[in-house]
Amino acid sequence: MAISRGDKVRVKRPESYWYNEIGKVASVDTSGIKYPVVVRFEKVNYSAFSGVDGGNNTNNFAEAELEAV
């Protein structure tokens, strides 16, 4: 099953901050890059500067690292 924009997916990359979290596909690149699927999440990760709220809420994944829900 091909993943497309707007699909809800579960992350299956064990080293990812969002492992087993559900996100929404923001875009899928078809140019042949290694991690073509951009996934957006509700919560942010830990990459914000000290004392500043926020962080990243998107990340790139390969289709094999995602499971449609």
Curated annotation (Swiss-Prot):
One of its GO terms (biological process) is photosynthesis. Keywords: Membrane, Photosynthesis, Photosystem I, Thylakoid. Pfam families: PSI_PsaE. It is a peripheral membrane protein. It is found in: Cellular thylakoid membrane. One of its GO terms (cellular component) is plasma membrane-derived thylakoid membrane. The keyword Membrane applies. InterPro entries: Elect_transpt_acc-like_dom_sf, PSI_PsaE. The keyword Transferase does not apply. PANTHER family: PHOTOSYSTEM I REACTION CENTER SUBUNIT IV A, CHLOROPLASTIC-RELATED, PHOTOSYSTEM I SUBUNIT IV. Belongs to the PsaE family. Stabilizes the interaction between PsaC and the PSI core, assists the docking of the ferredoxin to PSI and interacts with ferredoxin-NADP oxidoreductase. This is Photosystem I reaction center subunit IV. It comes from Prochlorococcus marinus (strain SARG / CCMP1375 / SS120).
